[in-house]
Amino acid sequence: MKCALIGEKLGHSYSKLIHEAFGLYSYELVSLPRDRVGEFMENGDFDAFNVTIPYKRTVMPYCSYISPEAQKIGSVNTVIRTQDGLHGFNTDYFGFKSMAARAGIDFAGKKVVILGSGGTSLTAKAVAADCGADRITVVSRSGEYNYENLEKLCDCEVLINTTPVGMYPNNGCSAVKLDSFPRCEAVLDVIYNPLRTELIMQALERGISCSGGLYMLVAQAAQSAKYFCSAEIGEKEIERVFRSLALDVQNIVLVGMPGCGKTTVAAALERLTGRKSVDTDSLVEEAAGMSVPDIFSEYGEAHFRELEAQAIRGIAKEKGLIIATGGGAVRSEEHTSELQ
């Protein structure tokens, strides 16, 4: 069985890794310009495929059947070829609901605020409504509720980010500060790269129930597999694939005083795991064209810390590395947050 993901830009997609981890079918990534979507839908040689931005609505007119949840949300992310034509489904609903449930987040009777008004916003709104939310408010850049009047929503209890703000490579950004929502008790962010966005880090610092979007991505893929080949992938298998992928994309960060052996341990871990190791002091030296002692001697510690901050900010965005930090790097709360 040949399956695929279609979208415009798929360079950073995890979908192939996830679907092939289920071990049920081959799976390819197919980047398509908009003017080739119709041709693919009508003549493509894939038995089934997922659809990502910006084509979740584009594919709908080509489907002879659209499932109730896809009609309700207004987008299709899963298509199968049948003798009766193309059948479209939406598995994001299942994925989002599963993510919230795993995080222990209950929408019943809650005041929910959704950041963003795109397709994923509609999914979040549908799930929250079906789960009994008391009030659901969508915040957009130009809507009645926007980022200039968030004080009107200070009673928010569940905050959901469906915007791309904070997504790789713009790590460290957040559409809002949780200080604007003093009653917030749960946060969901559909972004899965990075594993923990700035918004999720704010929630973790406050002890608020939260989840990033990676579990949603794996759960919706499992539901897609059900449509692809009638496979029943349970919670244990979803959890296994999620944990395996989360471990693969996280960096291993070594901290400690100078001379404690971080570089030696990094080299040993590199041999053991096959991961690439990176030393932040080496990155600083490469950028400056001189050694760390010479930087301290000629320009002082403040200049070195500026170079170190730039190095950490850049390397922390990457995935699956072993990062050996300088002795004073973790004295900065900003660095500690970035490296997580």
Spans of model-derived segments:
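NAD(P)-binding Rossmann-fold cofactor-contacting core
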Residues: 131-147, 281-287
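Conserved small/polar residues in nucleotide/adenosyl-binding loops
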Residues: 334-340
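Conserved lysine of the Walker
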Residues: 262
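ATP-dependent small-molecule kinase phosphotransfer cores
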Residues: 282-331
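Rossmann-like adenosine-cofactor binding region
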Residues: 145-211, 326-333
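Phosphate/diphosphate ligand-binding glycine-rich loop within oxidoreductases
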Residues: 2-103, 194-196, 202, 206-209, ...
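Glycine-rich adenosine-cofactor-binding loop
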Residues: 7, 88-93, 100, 105, ...
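Adenosine-phosphate binding glycine-rich loop
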Residues: 190-250
